[in-house]
C-alpha cells in the first residue's frame, strides 16, 4: 500500500472501532456510561479528538455547529464534559495510536532505509509542563519555582520511539517526571519486538542513556545500538584515536560475561569532540560513517518541536492525569496521520521538481496539521466521506516550503531554567 491507502485504512478502522460496543466497553471505567445520559461515550471520544486549544466553553459551542450529526447536547455544562471524560481510559487512545502503527508497518509497500539496508530508530525523552492539580501532583510529580516557592506546577516525562527514515512514531509513553529513561527505552524495545521491527534495526540514543546495563540489554537481544557517551566515562577517556575496540568485563556474581564494545571518537569540526559507544562491528559499518549515523537522530528533536509547538501538546484542555494521558496519545496519533500526508505530498513534490530549482522543497507540515485537525473529526463520524480528507493529500503538494541545507540554531545556555509554562486561564483564541 502507498501512504494514501494506509491513511484511508486507518480512518476506516477508527470509524469501525468507535462504533464497536466491545471496544468501547474494554476502555471505559466500571459503572461509567452504563446508563443513558445526555453524553454518550462515543460523543465524548469525538469531542476529545475534535477539541482545539481554545477554552472548553468555546469548544462545546463550536462542536454543535461543526459536527451537527453528532447530536452533541445543548444543555450541557463544561463541568459535565470534564467529568464524563474521566470515565474513558487513556488506553483507548493508545489503542488508536497502535492501530496507526500496525497499519503502517503491516501494509507499507516501500519503506525507507539508511544505506538501503538499516532501519534507524531514535529513542528520546522530553519533559512536558502540566497544569497544577492534585491528580497531576500525585501521578507525575510536584514542581516549585526557585524564585517563588508558592508557584507550583507538575511535569511529566514523555518518551517516544521514532522511525527516523519513515518519519513515524512507533511507540509513546508518558510517566512520572523522575522516571528512568532507560527503563522507558526498554519498554519501547519490547513493544517494537512484538511488531517484528528489529531486523537490521539500529537504535540511536543520546547522552545520558548509556549504562553498562542498557548496553548489555541490546547486546543480549542481538540488536545494534549507538549511544553517545559523556567525556567523564573511562571508556571515553581511553579512546585517544578514531576508534577503540575494548571489552566490558563481566561479573560472575551478576551472571554477566565479557562482551565487546566499540568506542568511536567523532570530531565535530568546531573544536568539540564526541564519543559514541556501539556494538556494531567494523565489517558491518566502518568508522567513517558513524558521524553521519549519529546525526541521523536529529529528526527526533524536530518531532518533539512539532509536537510541542505545532500540535501544542502542552496546552492541555484537562487538568487531571487521565485527561493528560488522553490528550498525549491523541496528539501522537495526529502526528502520525500528518506524517502519512506529508510523505505522500513530498513524493509528488520531488517527482515534479525541476533540475534548475535552486532549492528542494517539501510539504508544509504546519498547513497539514491545521487542515487535518479541521477535517478529521467530521470524517470520523461519517459526516463527510473519507474522500474529503484525501483531498488534503493533493492540497499539501501545492503548499510548499524550502529545504535549506546547513541551517542551524545554537542552543541557548543559562537563563532562568525551566519555569511554569501552562496557564490554565490563558487560551488561544484560534
What feature does the model see in each segment?
Residues 1-60, 74-75, 85-88, 95-97, ...:
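Single, function-defining residue in the core of a domain
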Residues 62-66:
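Short alpha-helical "recognition helix" segments of helix-turn-helix
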Residues 69-70:
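Blade-loop segments of beta-propeller domains
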Residues 119-121:
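Conserved beta-strand elements of the Class I
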Residues 139-145:
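Short Pro/Gly-enriched beta-strand edge/turn motifs at strand-loop
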Amino acid at each position: 500500500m502507498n501512504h494514501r491507502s494506509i491513511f484511508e485504512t486507518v480512518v476506516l478502522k477508527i470509524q469501525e472501532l468507535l462504533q464497536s460496543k466491545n471496544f468501547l466497553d474494554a476502555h471505559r471505567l466500571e459503572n461509567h456510561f452504563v446508563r443513558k445520559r445526555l453524553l454518550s461515550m462515543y460523543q465524548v471520544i469525538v469531542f476529545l479528538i475534535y477539541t482545539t486549544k481554545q477554552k472548553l466553553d468555546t469548544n462545546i459551542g463550536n462542536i454543535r455547529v461543526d459536527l451537527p450529526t453528532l447530536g452533541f447536547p445543548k444543555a450541557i455544562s463544561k463541568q459535565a464534559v470534564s467529568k464524563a471524560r474521566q470515565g474513558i481510559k487513556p488506553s483507548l487512545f493508545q489503542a488508536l495510536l497502535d492501530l496507526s502503527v500496525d497499519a503502517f508497518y503491516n501494509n507499507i509497500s516501500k519503506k525507507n532505509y539508511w544505506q538501503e539496508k538499516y532501519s534507524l530508530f531514535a529513542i528520546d525523552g522530553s519533559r512536558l509542563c502540566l497544569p497544577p492539580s492534585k491528580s497531576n501532583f500525585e501521578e507525575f510529580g510536584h514542581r516549585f519555582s526557585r524564585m517563588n516557592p508558592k508557584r507550583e506546577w507538575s511535569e511529566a516525562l514523555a518518551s517516544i520511539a521514532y522511525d527516523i527514515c519513515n518519519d513515524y512514531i512507533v511507540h509513546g509513553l508518558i510517566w512520572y517526571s523522575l522516571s528512568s529513561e532507560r527503563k522507558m527505552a526498554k519498554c519501547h524495545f519490547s513493544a517494537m519486538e512484538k511488531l517484528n521491527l528489529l531486523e537490521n534495526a539500529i537504535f540511536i540514543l543520546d547522552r545520558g542513556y548509556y549504562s553498562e546495563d542498557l548496553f548489555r540489554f541490546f547486546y543480549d537481544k542481538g540488536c545494534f545500538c549507538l549511544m553517545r557517551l559523556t567525556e567523564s566515562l573511562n571508556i571515553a577517556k581511553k579512546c585517544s584515536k578514531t576508534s577503540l575496540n575494548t571489552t566490558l568485563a563481566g561479573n560472575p556474581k551478576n551472571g554477566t560475561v565479557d562482551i565487546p564494545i566499540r568506542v568511536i571518537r567523532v570530531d565535530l569540526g568546531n573544536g568539540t569532540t564526541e564519543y559514541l559507544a556501539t556494538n556494531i562491528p567494523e565489517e558491518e559499518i566502518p568508522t567513517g560513517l558513524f558521524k553521519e549515523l549519529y546525526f541521523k537522530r536529529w529528526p527526533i528533536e524536530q518531532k518533539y518541536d512539532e509536537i510541542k509547538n505545532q500540535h501544542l501538546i502542552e496546552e492541555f484542555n484537562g487538568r487531571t492525569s487521565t485527561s493528560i494521558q488522553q490528550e498525549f496519545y491523541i496528539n501522537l496519533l495526529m502526528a502520525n496521520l500528518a506524517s502519512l500526508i506529508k510523505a505522500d505530498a513530498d513524493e509528488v513534490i520531488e517527482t515534479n521538481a525541476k533540475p534548475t530549482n535552486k532549492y528542494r522543497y517539501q510539504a508544509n507540515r504546519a498547513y497539514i496539521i491545521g487542515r487535518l485537525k479541521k477535517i478529521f473529526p467530521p470524517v470520523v463520524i461519517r459526516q463527510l466521506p473519507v474522500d474529503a480528507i484525501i483531498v488534503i493529500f493533493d492540497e499539501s503538494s501545492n503548499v510548499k516550503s524550502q529545504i535549506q541545507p546547513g541551517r542551524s540554531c545554537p542552543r541557548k545556555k543559562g537563563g532562568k531554567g525551566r519555569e511554569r509554562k501552562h496557564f490554565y486561564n490563558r487560551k488561544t483564541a484560534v
